[in-house]
UniProtKB/Swiss-Prot annotation:
The gene is ispF. GO terms for molecular function: 2-C-methyl-D-erythritol 2,4-cyclodiphosphate synthase activity; metal ion binding. It comes from Alcanivorax borkumensis (strain ATCC 700651 / DSM 11573 / NCIMB 13689 / SK2). It catalyses: 4-CDP-2-C-methyl-D-erythritol 2-phosphate = 2-C-methyl-D-erythritol 2,4-cyclic diphosphate + CMP. NCBIfam families: ispF. Pathway: Isoprenoid biosynthesis; isopentenyl diphosphate biosynthesis via DXP pathway; isopentenyl diphosphate from 1-deoxy-D-xylulose 5-phosphate: step 4/6. Its EC number is 4.6.1.12. Transmembrane segments: none annotated. This is 2-C-methyl-D-erythritol 2,4-cyclodiphosphate synthase. Its cofactor is a divalent metal cation. Gene3D superfamilies: 2-C-methyl-D-erythritol 2,4-cyclodiphosphate synthase (3.30.1330.50).
Length: 160
């Protein structure tokens, strides 16, 4: 019998100066960047927290604190890879991941496939195991006012 664990992650970043946002490991042209200590990939941060949460291993801030200068500007894909390596070492593997990106802008439809492909590559899995969806808050709240981006992520881990 296969054992399973479920993890949920959530992250938010405000817009800042810049000409693109990193989402799901993909640079997406935009009038702003995201304010963050690392590269600000809010999607990979939420996904990292979901993976860690499934095994009660804390959160991304515990493993890669923003008070540590070595993580300034860090590639969130590398952080996710390190986290997933520890998941594999613990005897688990990804069943599936489901991410919902919440923002008014930028428009993400043209980038969803690339995000799914990149996340699947980072997690050494099939693209069909990764879902990325985008939605808005109908111009309500901070995302609706175009002040930032939020992401929810859920993962299912299976014992190996």
């Amino acid at each position: 019998m296969v054992s399973v664990r479920i993890g949920q992650g959530f992250d938010v970043h405000a817009f800042d100066e810049g000409d693109h946002v990193m989402l799901g490991g993909v640079a997406i042209p935009h009038s702003h960047g995201l304010k963050a200590h690392s590269d600000g990939d809010v999607a990979l941060h939420a996904l990292s927290d979901a993976l860690l949460g499934a095994l009660a291993l804390g959160d991304i801030g515990h493993h890669f604190p923003d008070t540590d200068p070595q993580w300034r500007g860090a590639d969130s894909g590398q952080l996710l890879t390190a986290i997933y390596s520890s998941i594999l070492d613990a005897g688990w593997r990804l069943g599936n991941a489901d991410l919902t990106v919440i923002c008014q802008a930028p428009k993400l439809a043209p980038h969803i496939l690339a995000m799914r492909e990149r996340i699947a590559a980072l997690l050494q899995c099939e693209q069909g195991q990764v879902s990325v969806k985008a939605t808005t808050t109908e111009k309500l709240g901070f995302t609706g006012r175009k002040e930032g981006i939020a992401v929810q992520a859920v993962v299912l881990l299976e014992s190996q």
